[in-house]
Amino acid sequence: MTLQEDIIRQLEVKAVIDPKQEIRQSVDFLKAYLLKHPFLKTYVLGISGGQDSSLAGKLAQMAIEELRAETGDEQYQFIAVRLPYGVQADEADAQKALAFIQPDQALTVNIKEAVDGQLRALEAAGLEISDFNKGNIKARQRMISQYAIAGQTAGAVIGTDHAAENVTGFFTKFGDGGADILPLFRLTKRQGKALLKVLKADPSLYEKVPTADLEDKKPGLADEVALGVTYQEIDDYLEGHTISAEAQARIEDWWHKGQHKRHLPITIFDDFWK
């Protein structure tokens, strides 16, 4: 088995999908998890205005609405959370995402004060925090807020990790990589776009340039620039196609570098890192 084949196997990627079937599978998955855990009544998800949170949010709202209709339990709720650092440059896109999702509840928690307070505390301890590290602090603060909301609402936190993000390790460890349930796991970037098209999302939600937008000194830095490889190349790789040797090497290098992110904290019994 080649490394490419092994990665495809581990990430459960299918070369060809039926978007309607994938939507149904994710919705049923989200419903089943709450039904299996009757002490949970809500799903919580941060909404950025990008493709991934728009899709995960819509699937969550659909699941919650079906649960309410099927059980008669009005406690089932989906809580969408805006988590800007100060003023978000593409706030209009986030509002489009909320209009598409139509969440039961929408909260806004501005993380700027918390992040800046953490930076001041670290600097007082004699540490100079890089802009890149600050970006990771932002991502982790967003998860702190989401888990606080989930803790107060008997909730579980949804993550937006998908195959194209997973293979490159393009997420913050214990930041956006920290969640309870991943309804997009197995999907490539283009497959997620196909689901949004079926769900009749505004094209701007899946046609915009993907960006984590975490670094102050590199605002709106495109994912593809940061990764050095395009999503088309990543998706082609994950769907079993042949791509350039350079792109393949880049993807596989990211895969190896990100292995630690795909594991729980390392114990003496783990050997993947050796």
Curated annotation (Swiss-Prot):
Keywords: ATP-binding, Ligase, Magnesium, Metal-binding, NAD, Nucleotide-binding. Pathway: Cofactor biosynthesis; NAD(+) biosynthesis; NAD(+) from deamido-NAD(+) (ammonia route): step 1/1. Deamido-NAD(+) binds at residues 140, 173, 180, 260-261. GO terms for cellular component: cytoplasm. Mg(2+) binds at residues 52, 165. It catalyses: deamido-NAD(+) + NH4(+) + ATP = AMP + diphosphate + NAD(+) + H(+). Belongs to the NAD synthetase family. Catalyzes the ATP-dependent amidation of deamido-NAD to form NAD. Uses ammonia as a nitrogen source. Homodimer. This is NH(3)-dependent NAD(+) synthetase. It comes from Streptococcus equi subsp. equi (strain 4047). The lineage of its organism: Bacteria, Bacillati, Bacillota, Bacilli, Lactobacillales.
